[in-house]
Swiss-Prot record:
InterPro entries xref list: Aldolase/citrate-lyase_domain, Citrate_lyase_beta/mcl1/mcl2, Citrate_lyase_beta_bac, Pyrv/PenolPyrv_kinase-like_dom, Pyrv_kinase-like_dom_sf
Species in which this protein is naturally found: Leuconostoc mesenteroides subsp. cremoris
EC number(s) reported in the record: 4.1.3.6, 4.1.3.34
Superkingdom of source: Bacteria
Entry cofactors: Mg(2+)
Residues that coordinate or bind substrate: 69, 132
PANTHER family: CITRATE LYASE SUBUNIT BETA (PTHR32308:SF10), LYASE BETA SUBUNIT, PUTATIVE (AFU_ORTHOLOGUE AFUA_4G13030)-RELATED (PTHR32308)
UniProt-recorded name of the protein: Citrate lyase subunit beta
Catalytically driven reaction(s): citrate = oxaloacetate + acetate; (3S)-citryl-CoA = oxaloacetate + acetyl-CoA
Subunit text: Oligomer with a subunit composition of (alpha,beta,gamma)6.
Keyword set, alphabetical order: Cytoplasm, Lyase, Magnesium, Metal-binding
Similarity comment: Belongs to the HpcH/HpaI aldolase family. Citrate lyase beta subunit subfamily.
Organism taxonomic ancestry: Bacteria, Bacillati, Bacillota, Bacilli, Lactobacillales
Length: 302
């Protein structure tokens, strides 16, 4: 089974809200992203950083991947953000407003210095980039390949649409080019692609429609601003009974080939190639995450 981490949901948590920081792990997001940037006023930057640092030391967030969105490289806060989060053992640092690979190189250099300073193995802090402008989209391939630490790139639509002199529309046409560029850059680099937040919490139909679109395009997941969106995303990403049964047949064919000592995998007389195997493994991982199969991998009737 391939060991790629599921990242269907990346939930924003305001770094200045003690209750939300403390309780973020109970909602079951694949990734929890503590926000030290837009959600935090200038007067609260230091206290929010300390709050998140302390929480990372004391709160059990279960199996969720822990991400922090630090302040941008054009602010006086980012260096202290990086030091505190590396010291706290954060999994991933997300840099906002990334427009060039050089910005990720600067982030990596500061992370490396912090890892050495605090005795953390060099290379264990991962990075991701938020692309929020036309220049960032144009440079997406270079950004995605900026470092071996990169786990993903994300579209941030509010700043992007402002930069493009437009705004968000219900059909999402204004984001179609950026979504496809970011997705292709991520896939070419072998990392994850994350879609932007959907800000209208009262429009569940619109949220479902947008989530179905980004799932169809191939995004790994979506950034979220409300815990109730988690279940909705998981529902869209859940495989069907037919997909699960087909994946089970592929997995069984793999096991049969192993037992025979054969390097060729076949199913119903047809050769099974690597993309089919990878797709089957991902389907089973999603099926398990959604509790759609039993311990043997068989579909559970609902």
């Amino acid at each position: 089974m391939n060991n790629e981490r599921l990242r269907r949901t990346m939930m924003f948590v305001p770094g200045n809200n003690p209750a939300m920081v403390k309780d973020a792990g109970i909602f079951g997001a694949d990734s929890i992203m503590f926000d030290l940037e837009d959600a935090v006023s200038l007067a609260e930057k230091d206290s929010a950083r300390y709050l998140v640092y302390e929480a990372l030391q004391t709160v059990d967030y279960g199996s969720s991947e822990l991400v922090v969105r630090i302040n941008g490289l054009d602010t006086p806060f980012y260096k202290n953000d990086i030091k505190a989060m590396v010291k706290a053992g954060i999994d991933v640092i997300r840099l906002p407003k990334v427009e060039t690979a050089a910005m990720m190189h600067e982030l990596e250099s500061l992370i490396t210095d912090a890892e050495k300073e605090f005795g953390r193995p060099v290379g264990t802090t991962h990075m991701m980039a938020a692309i929020e402008s036309a220049l960032g989209v144009v440079n997406a391939v270079e950004i995605a390949n900026a470092s071996d630490r990169m786990i993903g790139i994300a579209l941030s639509a509010e700043d992007y649409t402002t930069d493009m002199k437009t705004h968000r529309y219900p059909d999402g046409q204004e984001l179609l080019y950026a979504r496809n560029v970011i997705l292709h850059a991520a896939r070419a680099a072998g990392i994850a692609a994350f879609d932007t937040v959907f800000t209208n919490l009262n429009d569940e139909e619109g949220f479902y429609r947008e989530t179905q679109l980004i799932h169809q395009l191939g995004f790994d997941g979506k950034s979220l601003i409300n815990p109730r969106q988690i279940e909705m995303v998981n529902k869209v990403y859940a495989p069907t009974e037919k997909e699960i049964n087909n994946a089970q047949n592929v997995i069984a064919a793999i096991e049969e080939a192993k037992q025979k000592g054969s390097g060729v995998i076949s199913m119903n007389g047809q050769m099974v190639d690597r993309p089919v195997v990878l797709r089957a493994q991902r389907v089973m991982k999603l099926a398990n995450a959604n509790h759609l199969v039993d311990s043997e991998g068989n579909y559970i009737e609902k």
